[in-house]
């Protein structure tokens, strides 16, 4: 053993010197490890004693076979690198004398080492010879070495696994020199099956391309060797058959099906293909369906079974009805591109589906229009894939991908390669994701804007969904989506994102705007109203410095107490002129004590600071009242006209006011007091520009003898509206007053409260509750219609459990209060008995006694509630009115009588 290690070390040392002559430096220890690996994979190499390019390539083939069999983890990292270096040495040995000398010396070392190894023990078989052959490149046969002292108990290293120890010679053994080695190798190859699992210790790979006789080895009886190998193969076959039988029995126990066929008679064990790209040998097509012998894996169209001989059989089965039903339900309730629906599609697509299967599935699940859209997108994706396949040269064309032409039959499509099934799956699922969402136009990304009360996360989700339909995937346009997420957001979210716009991503945007909701929007509108700005201007200017102004000179940078430019004039006190208030005497207006002016009109009370006590502040109110009021009482004569041709006098609010749709009509102060000029009355009308901004001004009549403050009745129509101080919002039109001899109930109007206080709604109350039956998504619901609710509310007990609901950020107020109530996740289609329909998104609240139909639904139904008057109805009937028909000659006018009641405490134009 010591001699063998010494020779091995000398061989490695010579090789290191040869590599050094080529300019390659290697470590001695690494070369030792490399040749240890060579001895393990190529036991025949040290025994041959010759190094040439042909034998070294055989070593490379052994390396490659070992790598393919056991994987890269069993092969040293530097094995192939050192093999290439030594190959270059052998190729260049004729050119470099030093390398040639090193190779020759190494061959001598190998021959000596091989001879020493084979002669370590005395021989017990005098007829056994050792055959030593030179390289084929030298063209001469090696001399035979006969030594009667050699022992046959030492096994040769050509087939270390299959050979066993031999203790006695067989008298019938042929002469080793007469053995046909190539013929024996061909016969042994017939017993090899590539589908059998590898042995625990595989024999070293053998390269049949070398036709030469075996190299230096201890010759053994080839018949005994083949007998042992055949016995091992027969035992392997028996074990494999037993394994298949046990699998069949286990399958029978799991499924409880006693009719499962055995591996010898039918398909063997079945498997559902889940690995696209893994090539499996295919055999005949089994077109018949096993209707009563389906296992859980047989619910998918294409399956594959392998029999006991390793032959693969493909089967095609119909879709399981439960899969189609589940996918159809998800597409109908949530939409074809909803996350839940896409999850089911991807689960089905993980299996092998032919183009015909995809077409059948889509036609059964989607509507006719969506099916055509999917088919057009699928064909377009297949064209692109076919072009790439043509460039790659794999032969998978458009007909194969779409199942048309020569591949229109199911039998032809069943034989597709797994990689082709994967391409069909990718094209089909990509086309499914391109389907449009019903009710969402999705024309362009720029049209997706955040609503005033919409959560930012919902807005980003709509943006990403639209981008996915346009770009194919949201990741393709992520930068564009991020830009639009800021630009199309509402002002509140833009203000929150602006400082971190270039410092975070889209996820950071969502985190910054997570707390912005309806309550935040209302507070923001109030803050903007206090500052006298719009919401957008307030958000843009809230971080800017606000410099104070001098009250004396009006310049910034100092206060009035530090102003040096103000010069106090000590001129003599001037005598007062004609009093501008009463126009009766010469005195200061603040000292005027007259009650009426020179024309007899009553004068308003004094304004300004009072004689005693602090000056009262402006009356303020949170909603609809005066914010930052600067109210001053002015007579009608102080009003101005916009132009000489203006018909009315301009009216404006004396304060910044915030109006919301929930507040209804509100009275806005103008600071203008009556009375009107003699023989006139006033008519208040809103300006058209204010109506466009969402503020509705109600018409009103001002009596001639009204001495109170003139107010404007206004209402926010849809959104929160800010009424700035001093902006013209209405006009007062003065009209001539015609006096009549009608009876007068009160002699003087005076400062009576503005507006009418005696109008009320009259409705007969009965024991019957006015209810209405509607169908929401074809499910019947009954609810009240006179509740006064703004939104529709369904009690939780009537809500189907499979209908999705989500939490909301809004609070519902009324008789009680519900914080963060549940709401339907999607819009429901309502339908009445007359087949009128629309969309609503109701709230769901538990423990309600009855469902409530809100104004969001009743406004779509155009329901009108009225209080009929018996007197007026009788008058209309006497004049020829037909109930249920309209007024007028053609009976196409108003269908219901107009309730009316006299107001005897009123006087003036329009009252009777």
Curated annotation (Swiss-Prot):
Residues 781-857 form the Peptidase A2 domain. A zinc finger (CCHC-type) spans 548-565. The active site is at 786 (protease). Residues 868-912 form the G-patch domain. Keywords: Aspartyl protease, Capsid protein, Coiled coil, DNA-binding, Hydrolase, Lipoprotein, Magnesium, Metal-binding, Myristate, Nucleotide metabolism, Protease, Repeat, Viral matrix protein, Viral nucleoprotein, Virion, Zinc, Zinc-finger. The keyword Hydrolase applies. Residues 113-149, 258-282, 593-626 are annotated as: Disordered. SMART domains: G_patch, ZnF_C2HC. PANTHER family: ENDOGENOUS RETROVIRUS GROUP K MEMBER 24 GAG POLYPROTEIN-RELATED, IGE-BINDING PROTEIN. Nucleocapsid protein p14: Nucleocapsid protein. This is Gag-Pro polyprotein.
């Amino acid at each position: 053993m010591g001699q063998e290690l010494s020779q091995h070390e000398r061989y490695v040392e010579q090789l290191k010197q040869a590599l050094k002559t080529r300019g390659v430096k290697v470590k001695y220890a690494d070369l030792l490890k490399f040749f240890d690996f060579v001895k393990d994979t190529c036991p025949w190499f040290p025994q041959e004693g010759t190094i040439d390019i042909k034998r070294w390539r055989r070593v490379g083939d052994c390396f490659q076979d070992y790598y393919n069999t056991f994987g890269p983890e069993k092969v040293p990292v530097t094995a192939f690198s050192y093999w290439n270096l030594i190959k270059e040495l052998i190729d260049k040995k004729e050119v470099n004398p030093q390398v040639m000398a090193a190779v020759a010396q190494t061959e001598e070392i190998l021959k000596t080492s091989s001879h020493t190894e084979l002669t370590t023990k005395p021989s017990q078989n005098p007829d056994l010879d050792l055959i030593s052959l030179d390289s084929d490149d030298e063209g001469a046969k090696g001399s035979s070495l006969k030594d009667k002292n050699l022992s046959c108990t030492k096994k040769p290293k050509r087939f270390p696994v299959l050979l066993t120890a031999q203790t006695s010679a067989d008298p019938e053994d042929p002469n080793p020199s007469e053995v046909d080695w190539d013929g024996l190798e061909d016969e042994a190859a017939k017993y090899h099956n590539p589908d059998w699992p590898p042995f625990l210790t595989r024999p070293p790979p053998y390269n049949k391309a070398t036709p030469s006789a075996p190299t230096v080895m201890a010759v053994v009886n080839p018949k005994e060797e083949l007998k042992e190998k055949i016995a091992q193969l027969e035992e392997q076959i028996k074990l494999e058959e037993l394994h298949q039988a046990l699998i069949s029995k286990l399958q029978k126990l799991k499924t409880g099906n006693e009719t499962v066929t055995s591996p010898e008679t039918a398909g063997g064990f079945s498997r559902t293909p889940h690995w696209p790209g893994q090539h499996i040998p295919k055999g005949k097509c089994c077109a018949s369906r096993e209707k009563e012998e389906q296992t859980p894996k047989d619910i998918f169209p294409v399956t594959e079974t392998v029999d006991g001989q390793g032959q693969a059989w493909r089967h095609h089965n119909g879709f399981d009805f439960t899969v189609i039903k589940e996918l159809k339900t998800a597409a109908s309730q949530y939409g074809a591109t909803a996350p839940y629906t896409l999850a089911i599609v991807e689960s089905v697509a993980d299996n092998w589906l032919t183009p015909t299967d995809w077409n059948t599935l889509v036609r059964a699940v989607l509507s006719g229009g969506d099916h055509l859209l999917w088919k057009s997108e699928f064909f377009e994706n297949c064209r692109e894939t076919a072009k790439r396949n043509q460039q790659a040269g794999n032969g998978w064309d458009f007909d194969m991908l779409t199942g048309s032409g020569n591949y229109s039959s199911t039998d032809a499509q069943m034989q597709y390669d797994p990689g082709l099934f994967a391409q069909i799956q990718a094209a089909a699922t990509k086309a499914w994701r391109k389907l449009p969402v019903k009710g969402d136009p999705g024309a362009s990304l720029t049209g997706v804007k955040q609503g005033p009360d919409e959560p930012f996360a919902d807005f980003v989700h709509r943006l990403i969904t639209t981008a996915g339909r346009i770009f194919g995937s949201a990741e393709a346009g992520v930068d564009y989506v991020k830009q639009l997420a800021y630009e199309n957001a509402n002002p509140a979210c833009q203000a929150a994102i602006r400082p971190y716009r270039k410092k975070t991503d889209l996820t950071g945007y969502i985190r910054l705007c997570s707390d912005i909701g309806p309550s935040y929007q209302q507070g923001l509108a109030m803050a903007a109203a206090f500052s006298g700005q719009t919401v957008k201007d307030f958000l843009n200017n809230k971080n800017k410095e606000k410099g104070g102004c001098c009250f004396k000179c009006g310049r910034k940078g100092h206060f009035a107490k530090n102003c040096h430019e103000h010069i106090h004039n000590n001129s003599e006190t001037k005598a007062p002129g004609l009093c501008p208030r009463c126009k009766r005497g010469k005195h200061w207006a603040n000292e005027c004590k007259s009650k009426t002016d020179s024309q007899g009109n009553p004068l308003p009370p004094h304004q300004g600071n009072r004689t005693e006590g602090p000056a009262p502040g402006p009356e303020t109110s949170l909603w609809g009242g005066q914010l930052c009021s600067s109210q001053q009482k002015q007579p009608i004569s102080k009003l101005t006209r916009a132009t000489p041709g203006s018909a009315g006098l301009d009216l404006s609010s004396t304060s910044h006011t915030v109006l919301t749709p929930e507040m209804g009509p509100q009275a806005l102060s103008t600071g203008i007091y009556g009375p009107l000029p003699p023989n006139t009355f006033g008519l208040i009308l809103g300006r058209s520009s204010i109506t466009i901004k969402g503020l509705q001004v109600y018409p009103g009549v001002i009596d001639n003898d009204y001495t109170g403050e003139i107010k404007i009745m206004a209402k926010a129509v849809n959104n929160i509206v800010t009424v700035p101080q001093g902006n013209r919002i209405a006009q007062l039109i003065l009209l001539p007053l015609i006096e009549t001899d009608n009876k007068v109930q009160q002699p003087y109007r005076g400062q009576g409260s503005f507006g009418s206080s005696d109008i009320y709604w009259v409705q007969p109350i009965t024991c019957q509750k006015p209810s209405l039956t509607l169908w929401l998504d074809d499910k019947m619901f009954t609810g009240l219609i006179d509740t006064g609710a703004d939104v529709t509310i369904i009690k939780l007990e009537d809500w189907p459990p499979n209908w999705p609901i989500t939490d909301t950020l809004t609070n519902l107020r009324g008789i009680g209060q519900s914080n963060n109530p549940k709401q339907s996740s999607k819009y429901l289609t309502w339908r009445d008995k007359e087949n009128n329909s629309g969309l609503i998104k109701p709230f769901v609240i538990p423990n309600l006694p009855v469902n409530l139909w809100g104004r969001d639904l009743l406004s779509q139904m155009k329901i009108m509630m009225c209080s009929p008057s018996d007197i007026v109805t009788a008058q209309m009937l006497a004049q020829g009115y037909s109930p249920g028909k309209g007024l007028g000659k053609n009976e196409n006018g108003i269908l219901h009588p107009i309730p009316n009641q006299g107001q005897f405490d009123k006087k003036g134009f329009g009252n009777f």
